[in-house]
Amino acid sequence: MEDLAVQAEELGLSSFWVYDTPMVHGDPFAALALCAKATSRIKLGVGVTSPTLRSIPAAASGFASLNALAPGRIICGVGTGNSARRTLGMPPTKSAELETFTASLQDLSAGRPISYREGVRVSDIQFLHAGPQQLPTDPIEFVVAAQGLKSAAIAGRRRTGLLSFAILDPDAWRAFQRARLEAADGPVVGDSYLTTSLCVLGEGEDPHGDAVRDAIGHTVLSFLVFAADKPSFAEVLGPEEREAVQRFLTQRGTTGTAPDRFRRLYTNYLGRIDPTERDLILPSLIDKLALVGTRDNLLRRIAALEAAGVDELVIQPVVDPPTELAELAKLTA
């Protein structure tokens, strides 16, 4: 992990991220601690942690500890746990809980006390040490994961950045930015990050071929996982996409209503797809969810996203990470 962070820093990339989905991925704090010691400039982000996944004191201490290792380079991404919670067979947390969680982490990391509740008991808590973990002069950057306007508004009220997954429509990003600014009661500080997958095509290369499906299929499959796990969402998809969801359920040996479906649906979640799953990676979903094209085509798409408010592109490479990071660096140089 830290070798990739070092490479990303050497390539001039601005940030390096890990997930916080305990049933699928390793511990983000352990991973980023290694990355913090191996790097000196690049920002290190968790995308994202969520309420009920981690308690407020534990999460705040974890991020403060990382910030002590890499002062001013830590990004705390927070969200409802749309993936992490579903891997437990649980629904995402409510927006109100997300906002309270975000505010509490911001306050604790800045050395301010908060009101902490467990059941009917309430205490005022704050960090009780004065060591390097508490560095308000080197603040932690906060971003709220937003797949819709409600979360974008939370980012505005909390004056944070935004992080979104596989939303490549510039109009959607303009709407996010409007919602964030309209909800804010003062200046909004924080960049906007777009997480997706990337495949740079050679001239004449098939944009929907096997090589492309292997490179970006994990992003498309995550869309099908969500649709398979939430039948009400699948119902609004087109006929070809609904059929792909049903084939995916059949391949995984479950149904959209089985109580234990999450254990089958989220196996290898966001990992490189199996060759038997390539036929599920529909051309329409490739075009919608991933950045695939020639260099010139991708530069135009990235410029349009930048004009809509996206500050940084984040990718998850799965086939050949060093090469894919180098491709991203060339595009964004």
List each language-model region with its residue ranges.
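Short, acidic/polar
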Residues: 1-8, 62, 146-153, 294-304
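N-terminal beta1-alpha1-beta2 module of alpha/beta enzyme domains
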Residues: 1-46, 140, 318
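Conserved, mostly hydrophobic/aromatic
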Residues: 12, 35, 66, 105, ...
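Conserved beta-strand positions in the central sheet of alpha/beta enzyme cores
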Residues: 17, 43, 75-77, 163-164, ...
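Acidic-and-aromatic substrate-binding clefts and catalytic sites of carbohydrate-active enzymes
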Residues: 20-27, 51-57, 167-173, 200-201, ...
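Active-site mouth loops of central-metabolism enzymes
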Residues: 49-56, 136-146, 198-201, 284-296
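Internal, glycine-rich beta/alpha segment that forms the wall or movable "lid"
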Residues: 58-190
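An alpha-helical appendage that flanks or caps ligand/catalytic pockets
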Residues: 91-131, 174-304
